């Protein structure tokens, strides 16, 4: 069966505000763009910034659509095991964090995993870039983006889609930070 008809050249989510994508003002600006002006002072964090948290992720996984929730749930389960068994600092669940607390946590994070969900690209990818954390993500070798943001072992660290090398990747990068 030929699936070429399903392919399309499109813009990706990274071309919109990824610094405060879920803020109230950003939501309003999307609804009434001609009334609320857009001025964003993005504060980037250097990757060399001292970081105390080995692994951190916050994501929803209790979703109605298993096709969206599966990869998130599987990643969270495996991360919890890896964090516990390797005595790493970090968390995959916890109380809701304010935007300020969340950004502070991202700035303190060494490895920011990013599961697939609604698609391959996610807000978390850009949060890692902005806050200088190492982006750990399923291999994106199958996808070409513009701008080319997914360059293996340069802009992100890939792991196998079946998670078979996840523990090894995390262990290696924690030991060789």
Regions picked out by a protein language model, each given a short descriptive name:
Residues 157-177:
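C-terminal "capping" alpha-helix adjacent to the active site of nucleotide-linked donor transferases
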Residues 1-123, 134-152:
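Nucleotide-sugar donor-binding catalytic core of glycosyltransferases
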Residues 129-130:
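Short alpha-helix at the nucleotide-sugar/activated-sugar donor binding site of glycosyltransferases
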